[in-house]
Amino acid sequence: MFLIKKRYFFSVIFLIPFYLSADTYSVNDKLYFGIGAGIISPNDVEIKTTTAQTANNVAFSANIDGEFEFDNGYQITGLIGYRLSDSLSFESEIGYSMFDYDKLNLTVGGTATSGGVTFTGGANSSHVVDGSISAFSMVFGPSFDFDFNRKVELVLGGGIGFASYSDEIKSVGNSTGLSYDEDQTDFAAKLKGGLNYSLDSKSFIQGDYGFNFVDSSIDNYTSDFTAHTFNAKFVINF
């Protein structure tokens, strides 16, 4: 799937610990919920064609080489976790991400044709892209926590799941020759690390960084989608 279509998205979070030997929160309360928001920073997506082909209903010429760049966007997340022990939890995180395309940078130029209109990009050229990607994601996996003191914990986790995204390009360089609107669902994975700060025995704030992957590549066209996320969440135990 057009890597750049990855709405990824992706992105999605899923970590949270529990009381180790400190009173960060009560280990008797095994179930916890969280909600948060943050920033998603997508990496560039490579576009490369060795032969002429059609992808996303757009006909591309052979030997195109370049990359799509994206603006930073926002992410809203929800978290449900269950403590298996004092230092191990299993979590499910859902997320909604939204970000815009920035530009298409071409090292080797070529053409793209859609709806009877042809976009032509020269070698070593850059073109403004009017488009966006939005994604819903869900990831499941373990989370480990390590106490620093009675208030602060280090959290490490990861998981696998899916990203369902909508990828739309309206125009490139004021031409609709490379325009499309596609919906895809792909495998997604995430690695995360962060800190928990206890507010009381029932709640805490979590700040974390995540590296997100979406298996969205298209053979002879685009690479997979990856992105960095930075989030803050409020979590409460039940």
What label would you give each PLM region?
Residues 68-83, 87-93, 131-143:
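Outer-membrane beta-barrel transmembrane strands
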Residues 35-39, 78-82, 138-144, 158-162, ...:
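Residues on the lipid-exposed face of transmembrane beta-strands in outer-membrane beta-barrel proteins
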